[in-house]
Amino acid sequence: MSRIALYPGSFDPVTNGHLDVVRHAVALCDKLVVAIGIHPGKKPLFTTEERLAMVERVFGPVAKAAGCDFGCTTYDNLTVTAAEKVGATLMIRGLRDGSDLDYEMQIAGMNETMAPAIHTVFLPASVGVRPITATLVRQIAAMGGDVSAFVPAEVASALKSKFAAGSPA
């Protein structure tokens, strides 16, 4: 039986912090499925299709190099429902600091009640990526700042193009 892990998030955009989590997660499972949450009330900077393409291009080679199968999907329901749908028994969550832990522990407890067969695995962020958040990356990019230290090169390029084209600031 293969061990399938789900790594959920908005990935708007993919950051080096997300990449750090994936690098660690692929060592824990036979297949990693990255699930992009679609929330009707939120207006993402990147379209669903753009985020799926980013996830595939950035994370896919990392999984392949580790000998881990890889997939990406979207979901618009409960995260545990998305995990069950792909057959995941592990849910991967990255932690930057104590406030992340407090929040994620609450969610993990609720998820465990709803889906006891799915276990949350917390992966602490490596020191160099702890301060990175997608929100801060978007803000820096919107103001014309250099985000190349915080995101993969192709994501930095996509952000530059988004804001140069007069897209949402």
Swiss-Prot record:
Query: What's its top-level EC category?
Result: transferase
Q: Residue span of the signal peptide, if any?
A: none
- UniProt xrefs under InterPro entries: Cyt_trans-like, PPAT, Rossmann-like_a/b/a_fold
Q: Which GO terms describe its molecular function?
A: ATP binding; pantetheine-phosphate adenylyltransferase activity
Q: Which reaction is this enzyme known to catalyze?
A: (R)-4'-phosphopantetheine + ATP + H(+) = 3'-dephospho-CoA + diphosphate
Task: Tell me a GO cellular component.
Answer: cytoplasm
Q: How is the subunit organization of this protein annotated in UniProt?
A: Homohexamer.
Q: What is this protein called?
A: Phosphopantetheine adenylyltransferase
What taxonomic ancestry is recorded? Answer: Bacteria, Pseudomonadati, Pseudomonadota, Alphaproteobacteria, Hyphomicrobiales
